[in-house]
């Protein structure tokens, strides 16, 4: 046998061994595979979860941030929720901090596709009029 034939014989033997190992792995785990398929069969042809679902994987303001204090989060401020970060709070068009009645509303806004370009930072107020907001912001970071 020439060396080229030996090489192809070794490659073919390795391919057959790999296929046999994969078949054995499926055989050993077949019960688990059936259990998984039964548990997730209802999702096989589904296109979406339905309702007012927001895909939070498309836009996440924390993806490009390495510093943990700069990551956006929803925090309970009194009886309302606010979106907070080292940059400040997400703001209303009039410049006041944006508040949410539920945590889900806050999460949907913060990690949804809403306009998040307005930010107000109470710690940069030279008059110190927003000292309470600044203290809260520093406490949640």
From Swiss-Prot:
UniProt xrefs under Pfam families: Pox_A28
- Mind telling me what this protein is named? Envelope protein A28 homolog
Q: Which InterPro entries match?
A: Poxvirus_A28
Description of post-translational modifications:
Contains two intramolecular disulfide bonds. They are created by the viral disulfide bond formation pathway, a poxvirus-specific pathway that operates on the cytoplasmic side of the MV membranes.
User: How is it placed in the membrane, per its record?
Assistant: Single-pass type II membrane protein
Give the similarity note: Belongs to the poxviridae A28 protein family.
- UniProt GO BP: membrane fusion involved in viral entry into host cell; symbiont entry into host cell
**Subcellular localization:** Virion membrane
GO CC annotation terms, alphabetical: membrane; viral envelope; virion membrane
- Role: Envelope protein required for virus entry into host cell and for cell-cell fusion (syncytium formation).
Residue numbers on the Virion surface membrane side: 22-140
Membrane-spanning parts = 1-21
Q: What superkingdom does the record give?
A: Viruses
The UniProt keyword set, sorted, is:
Disulfide bond, Fusion of virus membrane with host membrane, Late protein, Membrane, Signal-anchor, Transmembrane, Transmembrane helix, Viral envelope protein, Viral penetration into host cytoplasm, Virion, Virus entry into host cell
């Amino acid at each position: 046998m020439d060396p080229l034939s030996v090489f192809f014989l070794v490659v073919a033997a390795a391919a057959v061994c790999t296929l046999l190992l994969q078949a054995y792995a499926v055989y050993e785990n077949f019960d688990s595979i059936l259990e998984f398929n039964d548990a997730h069969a209802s999702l096989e042809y589904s296109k979406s979860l339905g309702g007012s679902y927001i895909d939070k994987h498309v836009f996440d303001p924390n993806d490009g941030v390495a510093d943990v204090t700069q990551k956006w989060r929803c925090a309970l401020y009194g009886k309302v929720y606010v979106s907070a970060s080292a940059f400040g709070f997400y703001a209303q068009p009039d410049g006041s901090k944006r508040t949410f009645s539920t945590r889900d509303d806050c999460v949907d806004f913060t990690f949804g596709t809403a306009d998040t370009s307005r930010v107000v930072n109470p710690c940069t107020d030279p008059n110190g009029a927003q000292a309470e907001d600044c203290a809260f912001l520093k406490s949640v970071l």
